[in-house]
Amino acid sequence: MENPVIIYVISDAIGETAQHIIRAVTAQFSLNKPADIRRHAFIRDENALLETLEEAKAADGIVVQTLVQSKLADYASNFCVKNHLQNVDLLHTLTAAVEAKTGLKSKQDPGNMRRLDSNYFDRIAAIEFAVKYDDCKDPRGLLDADIVLVGVSRTSKTPLSSYLANQNWKVANVPLVPEIPIPDELFQIPAERIIGLTTTPEKLAQIRKVRLKSIGLDEASSYSSEKRILEELEYGYATFKKLGCQVIHVEDKAIEETAALITEIITSYH
């Protein structure tokens, strides 16, 4: 097939979930051209729905719907049957199964989906925040952060910031380097929002040597020397003491495990 498969996502919310599912499915096919996914979000009445369905009909597309209200879902399904369009209703087959199993009726409230959408936008904002204030690019961001991670180089500050951002936390991080002054803003925020990250000298040396090798530099650089590492770690501990913050050892911990410890500490203060 020379022309791409055209798929219309019709949703009374954002339609992001349907789009993810479609991409997962189409990835299983050796298509000459990527599927053309056309997302129509916030379809809340029959007029808007009909306009979108007519467009899908003209393009001979596949309709994938996530319409919470059964009235609109039925309207879309009937239109597709009459016009010989392939139609996939992602919500109502499962909704019917849950209703049959529980004896309860679906609320059919798109507002519940909107609340999920709000959560989605909060997550995107948190991710953008983490990127903007990574590595203390702008110290002013420390004042607005939910969590501030502090530690010497290669103690997982950036990956932890990204992971926590995906859980809707606004995270900034500050690298500790003996020759670089600590930003004043770090002393202007409550200590309970700051987490110090550290590790063992042996583990840090190992990680830094791997890093140097990966970028084509000499593994014997002072960056990975025992003397330099001990100096930095001691500076880190002195800084943590000044800040009065909690400290986590990250050696031999997965990012998920360290992130769980961080959120446990942060939420314990609220």
UniProtKB/Swiss-Prot annotation:
Parts of the chain that traverse the membrane: none
Keywords, comma-separated and alphabetical: Kinase, Nucleotide-binding, Serine/threonine-protein kinase, Transferase
Binding, ADP: 151-158
Entry-linked InterPro entries: Kinase-pyrophosphorylase (IPR005177), PPDK_reg (IPR026565)
Known EC number: 2.7.11.32, 2.7.4.27
GO molecular function: ADP binding; ATP binding; phosphotransferase activity, phosphate group as acceptor; protein serine/threonine kinase activity
Catalytic activity of the protein: N(tele)-phospho-L-histidyl/L-threonyl-[pyruvate, phosphate dikinase] + ADP = N(tele)-phospho-L-histidyl/O-phospho-L-threonyl-[pyruvate, phosphate dikinase] + AMP + H(+); N(tele)-phospho-L-histidyl/O-phospho-L-threonyl-[pyruvate, phosphate dikinase] + phosphate + H(+) = N(tele)-phospho-L-histidyl/L-threonyl-[pyruvate, phosphate dikinase] + diphosphate
Superkingdom of source: Bacteria
One Pfam family per UniProt: Kinase-PPPase
UniProt similarity note: Belongs to the pyruvate, phosphate/water dikinase regulatory protein family. PDRP subfamily.
Function according to Swiss-Prot or TrEMBL: Bifunctional serine/threonine kinase and phosphorylase involved in the regulation of the pyruvate, phosphate dikinase (PPDK) by catalyzing its phosphorylation/dephosphorylation.
The protein's name: Putative pyruvate, phosphate dikinase regulatory protein 2
Species name: Listeria innocua serovar 6a (strain ATCC BAA-680 / CLIP 11262)
Lineage, opening ranks: Bacteria, Bacillati, Bacillota, Bacilli, Bacillales
